[in-house]
Regions:
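N-terminal small-residue-enriched
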Residues: 1-173
Length: 173
């Protein structure tokens, strides 16, 4: 395929691409250890609008059969459904016991160890944006000039700045 001409244009993403973008570009920024250290774009934004109205972002460890699902995190806290953004407002970070104590809230069941040698830190389980009311075909039809992204690869994220770059592996003009 021929390389398209660059420039500003609308982007519509398929489910897989939008999931990767949400996980990498936003999800890690909800992890409380980054916020506690002031390293996230969402540090000090609790209770403020961080997304357009109507956007709900959830981390849910209770989805049966999902790769990120679990009964208990690595600290023995039950896995749960945590609403991080509700109607565009930041309502919760993802917590382990340490960050929960720091913020004066209950742990969210996101304490995760890299191995038995490491201490738990707050990490996502199954983070997603809830579906809206728009029909995917109507969204695509509403774009006069743009790109539909089916798949990303090789990305880079700076969670403290809200800056990210991804290579479009599969997309259509």
């Amino acid at each position: 395929a021929k390389r398209p001409k660059g420039g500003q244009m609308s982007v519509v993403m398929g489910a897989g691409a939008s999931g990767i973008l949400l996980h990498e570009a936003m999800g890690h920024a909800f992890e409380a250890d980054f916020n506690r250290k002031g390293q996230s774009i969402f540090s000090d934004k609790m209770g403020q609008r961080v997304c357009p109205e109507g956007i709900n972002i959830v981390d849910d460890a209770t989805i049966r059969g999902n790769r990120g699902s679990l009964n208990f995190d690595d600290e023995g806290v039950p896995g749960q459904r945590t609403m991080m953004v509700e109607n565009g407002i930041l309502t919760s970070y993802l917590h382990d016991r340490i960050s929960a104590k720091f913020y004066g809230v209950a742990p969210t069941g996101n304490g995760r160890r890299e191995s038995f040698r490491s201490s738990p830190i707050p990490r996502m389980r199954a983070t997603y944006m809830e579906s809206g009311n728009a029909n995917p075909e109507d969204i695509i039809a509403s774009v006069e000039k743009g790109v539909y992204v089916d798949e990303f690869s090789n990305g880079q994220v700076k969670i403290g700045e809200g800056d990210f770059t991804f290579f479009v592996k599969s997309g259509y003009l």
